[in-house]
């Protein structure tokens, strides 16, 4: 199955999305390897983890965006900037699409390793941040 959204597909450029149906919220990520989805890391599972991180952050901060799109009613929007979009989209846009600058590995708090994430927009810092 190939998912399409405008000029991107799950085979090229579309890494994931989130939405809702009748008050049930979901996030979807594609397996990102080669031309599939996005490639920010050298291991496909890391691309998937960073994509899931992006989508889960957005489903938390802007859960009803699909309702806003369906109805044209902005009151459904949560954390959303008319100039840049959702909390995970702004860093990608600000980087000029350079995924390597916003999808990074961060150290775990207990020092046992690192985990791939996408930096989210921070209003406090006016820049992408990991927390």
Residue ranges and their predicted role:
Residues 1-131:
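N-terminal pro-sequences and low-complexity stem/linker regions of secreted or lumenal proteins
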């Amino acid at each position: 199955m190939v998912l399409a959204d405008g000029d991107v597909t799950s085979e090229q450029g579309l890494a994931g999305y989130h939405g809702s149906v009748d008050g049930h919220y979901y996030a979807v990520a594609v397996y990102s390897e080669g031309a599939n989805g996005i490639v920010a890391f050298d291991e496909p599972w890391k691309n998937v983890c960073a994509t899931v991180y992006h989508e889960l952050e957005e489903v938390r901060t802007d859960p009803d965006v699909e309702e806003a799109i369906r109805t044209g009613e902005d009151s459904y929007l949560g954390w959303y900037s008319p100039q840049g979009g959702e909390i995970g989209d702004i860093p990608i846009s600000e980087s000029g699409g350079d995924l390597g600058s916003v999808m990074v590995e961060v150290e775990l708090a207990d020092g046992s390793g690192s985990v791939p994430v996408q930096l989210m927009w921070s209003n406090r810092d006016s820049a992408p941040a990991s927390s």
